[in-house]
Amino acid sequence: MSAEKKPASKAPAEKKPAAKKTAPSADGKKRTKARKETYSSYIYKVLKQTHPDTGISQKSMSILNSFVNDIFERIASEASKLAAYNKKSTISAREIQTAVRLILPGELAKHAVSEGTRAVTKYSSSTQA
């Protein structure tokens, strides 16, 4: 009896944050494992929208997740500085947009700003309706 491996009929299950695992501790209470938050599911959804028949390795997903975290950190940091310069205690869409223009180069910044504006408009219209 030889078991043949058949090609997967559907996409492999995406990596999701680990569920909270419970193990009884010394005093009888169950301890929960902290969940690790990643952008993996969102990256996977975008990949499937743009290239439906393409997969992604765990290593590549990890690299992209680090990249998104890094860009997020840079934009948040720059937006925070901008808010402080203007003596504001709140980061608004304006600070985020300016931070994106300062951090991302040329054409990439233009596209990011237009997509961001579109997303904010879509969100605003959905919450008012």
Curated annotation (Swiss-Prot):
Its main location: nucleus. Coiled coil: none annotated. InterPro entries: Histone-fold, Histone_H2A/H2B/H3, Histone_H2B, HISTONE_H2B_site. The keyword DNA-binding applies. Belongs to the histone H2B family. Signal peptide: none annotated. This is Histone H2B.1. Core component of nucleosome. Nucleosomes wrap and compact DNA into chromatin, limiting DNA accessibility to the cellular machineries which require DNA as a template. Histones thereby play a central role in transcription regulation, DNA repair, DNA replication and chromosomal stability. DNA accessibility is regulated via a complex set of post-translational modifications of histones, also called histone code, and nucleosome remodeling. The nucleosome is a histone octamer containing two molecules each of H2A, H2B, H3 and H4 assembled in one H3-H4 heterotetramer and two H2A-H2B heterodimers. The octamer wraps approximately 147 bp of DNA. It comes from the Eukaryota. Residues 1-17 have a biased composition (Basic and acidic residues). The keyword Nucleus applies. Residues 1-35 are annotated as: Disordered. The modification N6-acetyllysine is found at residues 5-6, 10, 15. It is found in: Nucleus; Chromosome. GO terms for molecular function: DNA binding; protein heterodimerization activity; structural constituent of chromatin. Monoubiquitinated by the UBC2-BRE1 complex to form H2BK123ub1. H2BK123ub1 gives a specific tag for epigenetic transcriptional activation and is also prerequisite for H3K4me and H3K79me formation. H2BK123ub1 also modulates the formation of double-strand breaks during meiosis and is a prerequisite for DNA-damage checkpoint activation. Phosphorylated by STE20 to form H2BS10ph during progression through meiotic prophase. May be correlated with chromosome condensation. Gene3D superfamilies: Histone, subunit A. There is a cross-link at residues 5-6, 15-16 (Glycyl lysine isopeptide (Lys-Gly) (interchain with G-Cter in SUMO)). It comes from Candida glabrata (strain ATCC 2001 / BCRC 20586 / JCM 3761 / NBRC 0622 / NRRL Y-65 / CBS 138) (Yeast). There is a cross-link at residue 122 (Glycyl lysine isopeptide (Lys-Gly) (interchain with G-Cter in ubiquitin)). One of its GO terms (cellular component) is fungal biofilm matrix. Keywords: Acetylation, Chromosome, DNA-binding, Isopeptide bond, Nucleosome core, Nucleus, Phosphoprotein, Ubl conjugation. The modification Phosphoserine is found at residue 9.
